[in-house]
Design a protein with these regions (language model features):
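ATP-dependent carboxylate-amine ligase
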Residues: 69-78, 82-92, 96-243
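Acidic, Mg2+-coordinating active-site environments of NTP-dependent enzymes
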Residues: 1-103, 166, 233-236
Length: 243
């Protein structure tokens, strides 16, 4: 972007990466070909975005950053492709726990800020049933309304600042519901979701008002999804990574 490029120092080689087509043969970006998005270096295709071990546009940019960092070391393309396909992401960071009747169940419990949740939503192409809320730490939730309107079928809210988040959604006509527990919110989201959708825990808040930490919150979410699947006689096909 223009701001970061303005900080270039004279005499230093600069390699850029971004979510658009690269400006030079040495830069990394994303190109569209035959309705398929590819990670590229200049005009050289590195990998189709769909083959990344983790999903979301934000993770595609993370992959591009890693490619740019390894460029000076002449890492073979085949080795890069293997790693990009096999890396399944970090726990609680847009992690695909599994699927239930074609509905992806995604744990993004580490998303404790509006910015983090916005990245998760903007990076997804699936219809999203978002579960959010908790201790907002005094954040302004205004930015969440617009992106939820574009990305979410509904937003299910829990925790101390649920009403504050709801207030940011109302001007955009976003459907939302308030719940007393994460278990209830998870069950309701799974009831509404259909094959091809995703139920996403991305709270935009800290967990301390209801849970020991974000790890505990993630475990409650996973257990709730598994319990709902069992109660409805459906398999919870466990997977790692995110798609």
């Amino acid at each position: 972007d223009p701001w970061s490029m303005s900080m270039r120092r004279t005499g230093v080689d600069v390699v850029t990466f971004g979510g658009d087509a690269p400006a030079t043969a040495a830069d990394f970006g994303v190109r569209l070909g035959s309705n398929v998005e590819f990670l590229v270096c200049g005009d050289e295709v590195v990998l189709p975005c769909a083959e990344l071990g983790v999903g979301g546009a934000h993770n595609a940019q993370n992959a591009l950053a890693a490619l740019a960092l390894t460029r000076p070391f002449d890492v073979p393309l085949a080795a890069q492709q293997t790693v990009l396909r096999s890396f399944e992401g970090m726990p609680h960071r847009y992690q695909l726990l599994g699927s239930i009747s074609g509905v992806s169940v995604i744990d993004d419990s580490k998303a404790t800020t509006v910015v983090a949740t916005a990245a998760a939503l903007s990076g997804s192409v699936r219809t999203t049933w978002l579960i959010a809320g908790g201790d907002g730490k005094g954040q302004d939730f205004a930015a969440l309304g617009a992106i939820a309107a574009r990305s979410c079928k509904a937003v299910y809210l829990i925790g101390r600042d649920a009403n504050k988040i709801a207030a940011s959604l109302e001007p955009y006509g976003v459907t939302y519901r308030l719940f007393e527990s994460l278990q209830d919110a998870t069950h309701a989201a799974l009831e509404g979701a259909t094959s091809g959708d995703q139920v996403l825990l991305s709270p935009a808040c800290a967990s301390w008002d209801m849970f020991r930490n974000y790890h505990h919150r993630a475990q409650v979410f996973a257990d709730a999804a598994a319990a709902w699947a069992a109660a409805h006689g459906r398999d919870f096909a466990a997977r790692k990574g995110a798609r």
